[in-house]
């Protein structure tokens, strides 16, 4: 019997140890002292080390971790679930940028992550606030952007009981995020947020999601007031319920304000192995017609863009840039080709896929020559080998940081490396120039429908761009044409959605870019279809004094879809729009606006310069509504 009682006592003790979440003997000693302190607190508060008089709240803990991780802004759409985080963050000097749609907040955080090469943060309220972000989170996942999404949630005791905006949010975000977590105790806030940020930035970057029930964020006094204690409890059941509620809230706030480390955890970035680097070096040395395709992953830290440029120049290969890598080599670098990628890939004897993926953008690998040696570099194993064996085969595959790999290859080649034969570079340059000349002729064509030639206007836009401009691409046909004509001036000066092909990124990306670089002009290149998704954010630009320049290619049509649908089905159903005065919409939201049509086409450059001057003044955003006509420039361009 005695043995049984001893065993039972041990089991009960272990259960209490677990339930109280005792993490050390020092904590246990502290609990025992509090139990006998007679400090006027409830016995369970003492057992769990709760400070009943504290006015602090969980939002302060969240904000302190973000501040320690050098987060400078949080993009939000307000909601009662997350108010403590926003108030606490602002008190710590973190800028709170509130938007007109939750999806914009996440797109803005995505842009910050790309441009600052760190974590971007968005916070939204529970339920529909979170479901509104799903497209942007998926876009960030496919674009490999490290961002933290903070979401509110119903009180812990009301989960699954029909509370306002209570849904299973975790199940929605698990497929989209590298890391998801729900915090139910204040002492877990700090380690959870630190771990989430580490996960977002480690390996192949991506979005992470942390859910905070409302009672984890508000002060103890308010939570106790709202939890539902019965002050006149009579009988066993009512008293037992009170005891349970007291246990719950005491455990929730237990040891909440104990000192914790809030600084960043070390991130894990895959690095190339030396033997793989040597294999690539040998292929480069023997190649006569190498081609280098650089994608967005090459812009990720730790390598700085300037060091990557030096490595690319040392390799000496003709280069094609895509995604965030556009602009890496500036406007007119002799190694960069723009128009003849298919021809180059067909004739190449070495193709280096530096963060470039064999998806629809490379015809799933079918555009790669069967005679070419192929090197694939990517942090993501699935992207590294996408469609391999089906349409292409790699000779060297390296799952590692792309820019680090290129820098190490360049260093291993050394200063005595004989660069690519000039005949190969010269032949591609001649073909590229021929294509540019053909495009220039199309720019000079007068359209018979009375509207501007979009190619001619885009050339004017390109000529008007200052060297510090950041370009945001959000659209289909008009933006697709711009990608061939408008040239970003430097690294990290081009933002597009990435592989997901998402429409609607414009307002959010521009907001994020302008927040990071408030003194630089940010241009949104919009189609008239895509501008409808985020045009209301001109209100956000005005309220936060973050002026941007919007360029709308207005042909009153979802033209990228119409190009295939109309000739194939002889129907324009759902593709027609109106020649809407989007500039007047911007004006009504406190911005400057102008329309360019056939009557003032000769003043296009002057109007663009005026838009830039308005933006540079810091007083207003600008929107130029350009009434364009149809061309055959992008016939057959649809991707499936």
UniProtKB/Swiss-Prot annotation:
Broad enzyme group: lyase
Family annotation (Gene3D superfamilies): 3.40.50.970, TPP-binding domain
Segments crossing the lipid bilayer: 2-22
CDD domains in the record: TPP_BZL_OCoD_HPCL (cd02004), TPP_PYR_POX_like (cd07035)
Keywords: Endoplasmic reticulum, Fatty acid metabolism, Lipid metabolism, Lyase, Magnesium, Membrane, Metal-binding, Thiamine pyrophosphate, Transmembrane, Transmembrane helix
MF terms (GO), sorted A to Z: acetolactate synthase activity; flavin adenine dinucleotide binding; lyase activity; magnesium ion binding; thiamine pyrophosphate binding
Cofactor section: Mg(2+); thiamine diphosphate
One GO CC term, this protein: acetolactate synthase complex
Annotated catalysed reactions: 2-hydroxyoctadecanoyl-CoA = heptadecanal + formyl-CoA; (2R)-hydroxyhexadecanoyl-CoA = pentadecanal + formyl-CoA
Domain of life: Eukaryota
Annotated thiamine diphosphate binding sites: 102
Thiamine pyrophosphate binding: annotated span: 477-557
This protein's record includes keyword S-adenosyl-L-methionine: no
Cofactor binding summary note: Binds 1 Mg(2+) ion per subunit.
Binding residues annotated for Mg(2+), in chain numbering: 528, 554
GO biological process: fatty acid alpha-oxidation; isoleucine biosynthetic process; L-valine biosynthetic process
Primary residence: endoplasmic reticulum
Location within or outside the cell: Endoplasmic reticulum membrane
KW Iron-sulfur (keyword) present: no
Membrane topology reported for the UniProt record: Single-pass membrane protein
Family (UniProt): Belongs to the TPP enzyme family.
Function text: Endoplasmic reticulum 2-OH acyl-CoA lyase involved in the cleavage (C1 removal) reaction in the fatty acid alpha-oxydation in a thiamine pyrophosphate (TPP)-dependent manner.
Name the record gives this protein: 2-hydroxyacyl-CoA lyase 2
Annotated source species: Caenorhabditis elegans
